Amino acid sequence: MVKSINSELIYSIISHHINHFLNVKKFVKHDYESHMILLTVYSHFLFQTMSKGMSFNWAETFAETETEEHKQLMRDRKLSIFAVSENLLLPQETVRRKLEKLCNRKLLYYSKSEGLSLGKKFRETIEPLGKADGKDIFALVEKFKKA
């Protein structure tokens, strides 16, 4: 554990956050609240797979988002607009409007009976962002190790 964080490390942490924000705009081309909604659905998917004892590497995780098993898992453990709203402390109407745009772009899928799940274009849109973020995070971890 880092006992003290120097200004260079603080700068690196802040730079990581700024880079992530800019990468969302560059790769995904939507606002940050929409991105957090998308990440909430993705996080729900990952948590459900882990709770079933499944574990995937980077490539497998993205491949799994396109399977029937993913769709069934998300139906069985339905995620609602209300749950996303509560999780992100956003008004339900805001979540609903942003969700509509994400669904139109096929990043997410939503129906009242099946709940929220990752859409057909999730992988092709988010995987490049994940790779860019991953590089930044690993570089940040190395700086923490050196501190």
Label the model's feature ranges.
Residues A63-T65, S80, L107, K112-K135:
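Short, cationic-aromatic polyanion-contact patches
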